[in-house]
C-alpha cells in the first residue's frame, strides 16, 4: 500500500506596489515611473495637475487616481490604502529607484521580510553633483513598509512612516533630484518654512530675537563643519548658507504668526458715540 503524497505549501512571495503622489510633475514623472517599472504595480495619486502629468503617467503604464489635495500625510495614506498589495514603496515624483536598490528590494521580498518597515539612505543631486555632505546626506527615509503595520504620520512638514515594531535598513541609495536650481530651492524653502512655522505655532512654540540670532548660525556650522559641507567646496558652502537662511525664515515667520495673533486678540478701540 502506497502512502499518499505529502504536499508542502511554499511561502508566497510578497508583491510590491510603488505609490507616487503628484501635482504638476510632468518634468519628473516619466523617469520616476520608469525607475519603478520592475514593481508589481505603480500607483499615481494626482491632485489636480494642469500639465501633462496624467497623460505621461498613463502612457508609462501606471494606475492613475485623481483626488483633491488633503495634505501630504493623508494623501500618502490614501495611496497606500488604494494600492493592490500590502507591501508599499512610497516614491516622490522627483526621486528614482536605481537598479542596485531595486535589486536589493526584490531580493528582500523574495523571502518573507523579517521587519515590517525599512529605511534607506537618500542622496540628492544639486548644483551639478551628488551631495554626500551636509544635512542632505545620508537623509535616511522609511519608504518600504507593510501597510498592515505602518502609517504615515505628521502634520504639514516632516511627514514620516510610523512602523509597529523595529525598522530594518537597506544599504543602497534612493536618488533625489530635489531642486532645478537655486531659484527653485529658494521658492521651495519659502513654501516649506511657512508650513514649518505654522506647525510650530500650532504646537505652542514661540520665537524671539535670540532664536533669530542663534539658530541660523548653528545650522550653518552644523552643515558646513560637523556635516563636512566644506568637503564639497562652493556647493557645500552654498547648501550650508541656504540651511541657515531656511532656519532664519522659519523662526521669523513663527515670530510673525505670534505677533499677528497678539494683534488680533487685542481689544479694539471704539469710537465715541
Go through each PLM region and give its residues.
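Catalytic-site signature of metal-activated, phosphate-bearing donor transferases
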Residues: 74-81, 86-89, 98-261, 272
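Acidic helix N-cap motif at the loop->helix transition within catalytic regions
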Residues: 27-30, 51-60, 100-101
Amino acid at each position: 500500500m502506497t502512502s499518499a503524497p505529502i504536499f508542502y505549501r511554499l511561502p508566497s512571495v510578497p508583491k510590491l506596489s510603488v505609490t507616487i503622489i503628484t501635482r504638476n510633475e510632468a518634468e519628473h514623472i516619466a523617469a520616476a515611473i520608469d525607475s519603478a517599472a520592475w514593481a508589481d504595480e505603480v500607483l499615481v495619486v494626482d491632485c489636480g495637475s494642469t500639465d501633462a502629468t496624467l497623460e505621461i503617467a498613463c502612457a508609462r503604464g501606471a494606475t492613475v487616481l485623481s483626488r483633491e489635495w488633503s495634505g501630504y500625510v493623508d494623501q500618502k495614506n490614501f495611496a497606500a490604502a488604494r494600492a493592490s498589495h500590502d507591501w508599499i514603496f512610497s516614491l516622490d515624483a522627483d526621486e528614482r529607484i536605481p537598479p542596485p536598490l531595486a535589486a536589493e528590494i526584490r531580493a528582500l521580498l523574495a523571502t518573507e521580510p523579517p521587519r515590517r518597515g525599512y529605511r534607506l539612505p537618500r542622496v540628492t543631486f544639486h548644483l551639478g553633483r551628488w551631495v554626500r555632505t551636509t544635512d542632505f546626506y545620508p537623509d535616511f527615509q522609511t519608504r518600504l513598509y507593510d501597510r498592515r503595520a505602518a502609517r504615515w504620520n505628521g502634520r504639514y512638514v516632516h511627514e514620516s512612516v510610523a512602523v509597529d515594531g523595529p525598522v530594518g535598513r537597506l544599504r543602497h541609495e534612493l536618488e533625489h533630484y530635489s531642486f532645478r536650481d537655486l531659484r527653485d530651492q529658494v521658492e521651495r524653502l519659502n513654501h516649506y518654512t511657512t508650513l514649518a512655522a505654522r506647525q510650530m505655532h500650532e504646537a505652542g512654540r514661540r520665537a524671539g530675537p535670540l532664536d533669530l540670532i542663534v539658530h541660523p548660525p548653528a545650522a550653518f556650522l552644523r552643515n558646513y563643519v560637523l556635516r563636512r559641507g566644506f568637503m564639497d567646496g562652493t556647493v557645500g558652502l552654498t547648501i550650508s548658507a541656504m540651511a541657515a537662511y531656511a532656519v532664519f525664515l522659519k523662526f521669523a515667520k513663527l515670530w510673525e504668526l505670534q505677533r499677528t495673533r497678539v494683534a488680533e486678540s487685542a481689544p479694539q478701540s471704539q469710537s465715541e458715540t
